């Protein structure tokens, strides 16, 4: 108390008067707060209710951002109505009109992002079977299939690739409709069914070494429709999309393994009429393939192990010796299935 009196005494007279005015003003405000004003109109409370409802929407809800922006827009509209009709406050109206325009633009953007994306009718099958289970969005799938690929057809009997002639560097394809058969020097190897890669072994084996040619002949056994990518442009695209690169790596590895298993498992064949054609690999044991694949986590290493393990078996069969020796254990291709 003594310190306070000393400070007041040492201050100039005009400053003392200002302090007294401030003290008087504060005391006056305190007396004014004793009388509360009447409750605002119902529209004011509706606006705040909309804000509160938007903030408590759980983030786990799929459309929570759209609902949040919608509730904020509704709350701003109620505030504008309240400011114009019941308060006649221009500043409140301007601020809420600004907030309304910002939230409404964001609301429109979010609704646009949620629009259903159309996928071509011919491509719906491979999307739902191959890409959708791996969480590839329709938008990303359309980017993958809409820029540097095309849908092509082959009539029955036409060839997709000819051994020792067709380059493997040009394309990568997925069969959409029909069925194809793979053969070597007239000997049937295996069939290619819809929703499967046509040339996945060649694509994997020549990632580092270019300039190779097909070592097998791939022929349309029915009227076929396939999706074809330009290999060079696809490679550049996948370099900029690490997620899709891993998806392709997984799908191609799975496709090669499926082709390998299908050699000795007729139930995996799509057409029974192809099962009647003798395959040079039909006498190999499925257990040999399973054991070789189980011995390693890498598909290519497993295939190479399988090749080494089956080369002895093939040498014991005169009708298979010429075929298996033509490939040996060289680069991975359709020949791994023998």
From Swiss-Prot:
GO molecular function: cAMP binding; structural molecule activity
A Pfam family it matches: POPDC1-3
Glycosylated sites: 21, 29
Regions of this protein lying in the Cytoplasmic compartment: 62-65, 113-338
Main subcellular localisation: membrane
Record keywords, A-Z: cAMP, cAMP-binding, Cell adhesion, Cell junction, Cell membrane, Developmental protein, Glycoprotein, Membrane, Nucleotide-binding, Tight junction, Transmembrane, Transmembrane helix
Cellular localisation: Lateral cell membrane; Cell junction, Tight junction; Membrane; Cell membrane, Sarcolemma
Protein's UniProt keywords contain Kinase: no
Segments in the Extracellular topological domain: 1-40, 87-91
Nuclease is among the record's keywords: no
Membrane topology annotation: Multi-pass membrane protein
InterPro entries: cNMP-bd_dom_sf (IPR018490), POPDC1-3 (IPR006916), POPDC1-3_dom (IPR055272), RmlC-like_jellyroll (IPR014710)
A GO term from the CC aspect: lateral plasma membrane
Annotated GO biological process: epithelial cell-cell adhesion; heart development; positive regulation of locomotion; positive regulation of receptor recycling; regulation of cell shape; regulation of GTPase activity; response to ischemia; skeletal muscle tissue development
TM ranges: 41-61, 66-86, 92-112
Its job: Cell adhesion molecule involved in the establishment and/or maintenance of cell integrity. May play a role in vamp3-mediated vesicular transport and recycling of different receptor molecules. May be involved in the formation and regulation of the tight junction (TJ) paracellular permeability barrier in epithelial cells. May induce primordial adhesive contact and aggregation of epithelial cells in a Ca(2+)-independent manner. May be involved in epithelial movement during corneal sheet formation and regeneration.
Family according to the record: Belongs to the popeye family.
Protein's name in the database: Popeye domain-containing protein 1
Native species: Xenopus tropicalis (Western clawed frog)
